[in-house]
């Protein structure tokens, strides 16, 4: 029997399946809950049937700091790389959440900012969330994608009503991060832009 091996730059040729923490925990998610959920996926046999992804949703985000001004986790996710390494060690993959907006749905820091160094904080945003629900003039997709790759993440949920320019920036940032990371668009990617979503993401949610 002839075996044909094809090599290309396309990932996620079949729909990824797994677990996302938002419906269960919303903003109460933390490192211990993620690890417990990963363990449960293995213990219940789901991993052996193709369930591969353990995805952290909104509320992991802390502040931007360090030489790359990349977004860092808050106190709920100490040693985030160690957590990802553990998820990988039990045969699963790890996913993370972000948004092109200054602030996420839950009021945490996004991938853009109104200040050059991305100085917004959760406490500041929470006072008037509606003031931060826009795409800021300063963009940090490259910084954040590089950091996600260094932590070892395999999947990114990119949230809120998508526009092509923001999607293009994150798509290319992930492709140039040095790691294969699936880009999932959520939520309400306008259907009339479907050709762009096909070109610039691995999966998308229309509305």
Language-model features, listed with the residues they occupy:
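Short secondary-structure boundary/capping segments
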Residues: 70-72, 111-113, 170-173, 197-204
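An acidic-aromatic substrate-binding cleft motif
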Residues: 5-31
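Glycan-recognition surfaces
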Residues: 130-132, 140, 182-207
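Aromatic-lined carbohydrate-binding/catalytic grooves of carbohydrate-active enzymes
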Residues: 37, 41-166
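Short, solvent-exposed loop/turn segments at secondary-structure junctions
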Residues: 24, 61, 101, 189-190
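Extracytoplasmic, non-cytosolic globular domains
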Residues: 152-156, 160-189
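Extracellular/periplasmic catalytic domains that process cell-envelope and extracellular macromolecules
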Residues: 9-14, 46-49, 87-89, 149-150, ...
């Amino acid at each position: 029997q002839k075996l044909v091996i094809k090599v290309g730059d396309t990932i996620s040729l079949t729909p990824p399946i797994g677990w996302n923490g938002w419906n269960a925990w919303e903003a109460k998610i933390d490192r211990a809950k993620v690890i417990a959920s990963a363990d449960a996926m293995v213990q219940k046999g789901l991993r052996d049937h193709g369930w591969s992804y353990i995805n952290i949703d909104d509320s992991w985000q802390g502040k931007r700091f360090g030489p790359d001004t990349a977004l860092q986790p808050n106190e709920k996710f100490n040693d985030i790389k160690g957590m990802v390494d553990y998820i990988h060690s039990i045969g699963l993959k790890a996913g993370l959440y972000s948004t092109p907006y200054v602030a996420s749905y839950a009021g945490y820091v996004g991938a853009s900012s109104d200040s050059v160094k991305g100085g917004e904080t959760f406490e500041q945003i929470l006072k008037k969330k509606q003031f931060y629900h826009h795409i800021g003039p300063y963009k940090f997709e490259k910084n954040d994608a590089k950091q996600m790759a260094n932590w070892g993440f395999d999947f990114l949920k990119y949230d809120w009503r998508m526009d092509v320019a923001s999607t293009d920036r994150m798509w290319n940032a992930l492709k140039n991060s040095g790691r294969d990371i699936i880009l999932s668009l959520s939520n309400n990617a306008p259907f009339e832009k479907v050709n762009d979503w096909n070109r610039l993401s691995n999966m998308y949610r229309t509305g």
